[in-house]
């Protein structure tokens, strides 16, 4: 049945964005097309083109919204109260894991491994602006404005990204390897923020990782 003869109720924006993310997870960023998104959203291509200037605008909106959602979730850190610096690092660890285990990130790692890195590292993109603002507000905001904060923010971003955008490609990750990976990242983040690498507060809390919450405990 053609797009013009199929009469269905239009989906909400949230439904279309979720369908876009599902299409990206299934087909990767280069192959996910309007037809895939429309099918998953139970609508037609006409509706998509009427509401978004082009497929790239839809993908940008969907992925940016998901990034903001994950970064918001990352701030909800369970466990005992930590010193401010250690808490900031734990928030970054949680954000890293949420991204690393996201199906869209997994698809991008398989099909376009450099695309996500470029999108977040390039200063002119909305994803970079979002990540940078989040880091300066919740991770490096205690540092003086100017070169010191900018240097630390860039160090945290470039240190965490390879972990966040390099998910396990084959099957579930071994729990021991996973814990070791996040301990290494934690140590590097301490150095980025000028904190002792052998911080006892963080060492105790990065020994166990919860698959249910996607966060270090």
Show the residue positions of the predicted features:
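Secondary-structure edge/capping motif, primarily at the C-terminal ends of alpha-helices
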Residues: 74-81, 109, 113-116, 163-171
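Short, basic, alpha-helical segments at the C-terminal edge of helix-turn-helix-like DNA-binding modules
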Residues: 64-72
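Short hydrophobic/aromatic patch on the recognition helix
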Residues: 41-52
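Alpha-helical bundle regulatory/interaction domains
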Residues: 1, 62, 92-100, 122, ...
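Hydrophobic/aromatic-rich alpha-helical bundle segments in the mid-to-C-terminal region
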Residues: 107, 141-189, 196-205, 209-210, ...
């Amino acid at each position: 049945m053609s797009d013009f003869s199929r009469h269905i109720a239009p989906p909400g924006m949230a439904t279309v964005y979720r369908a876009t993310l599902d299409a990206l997870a299934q087909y990767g960023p280069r192959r996910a097309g309007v037809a895939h998104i429309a099918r998953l959203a139970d609508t037609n291509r006409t509706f998509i083109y009427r509401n978004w200037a082009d497929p790239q605008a839809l993908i940008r909106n969907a992925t940016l919204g998901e990034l903001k959602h994950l970064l918001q979730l990352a701030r909800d850190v369970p466990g005992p109260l930590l010193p401010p610096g250690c808490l900031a690092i734990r928030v970054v660890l949680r954000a890293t894991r949420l991204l690393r285990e996201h199906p869209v990130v997994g698809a991008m790692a398989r099909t376009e491994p450099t695309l996500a890195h470029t999108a977040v590292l390039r200063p002119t993109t909305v994803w970079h602006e979002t990540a940078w603002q989040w880091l300066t507000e919740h991770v490096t905001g205690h540092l003086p404005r100017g070169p010191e904060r900018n240097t630390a923010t860039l160090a945290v971003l470039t240190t965490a990204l390879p972990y966040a955008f390099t998910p396990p490609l084959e099957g579930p990750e071994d729990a021991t390897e996973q814990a070791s990976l996040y301990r290494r990242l934690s140590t590097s983040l301490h150095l980025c923020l000028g904190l002792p690498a052998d911080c006892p507060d963080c060492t105790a809390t990065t020994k166990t990782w919860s698959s249910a919450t996607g966060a270090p405990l």
